[in-house]
Amino acid sequence: MKRRPAFTLIELIFVIILIGVLGAVALPKFKGMRDNAKTTSELSTAASVQTAIDACHGEWVINEGTFACGFDIDPADPAQFDASSGYPITLGSSDTTPFDKILKNGKSVKWIKGADGYYRGPASNGGVKPANPDIAGKPDSNDYWEYNSTTGILQLVDN
């Protein structure tokens, strides 16, 4: 009777243990990658909004105070455009959807307009859990975005 080459039971157990250890080390890294992707996407969207705001202001400067932005904003309406600074007050349809004219899903974001005229909206609707300790400049569910229509600045406010 010929002996056929095969793996011993010890070798198989060793391979199973090795796969288990590699899986235990790799899984937490993949979880962090998902949160990083969501955070990067949110920061990219915020940069796009800031670019649109800056483009409107740039057109106002080039046209010497005449507002001619490509968005559907009425320059004569003081609720939509700040004639003194050249920044759009809203790039949306209402106080609760201030960016729906420039964001594809702008209506689904829950923004509010404060008494101070600032728009505030939640950061990290994608479900990125709060970091402990909080990392400045990285949006999580404790933070919020703030748009100042006087200065045209959209910024992340860390809580």
What is the predicted role of each segment?
Residues 35-63:
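Membrane-proximal N-terminal amphipathic helix
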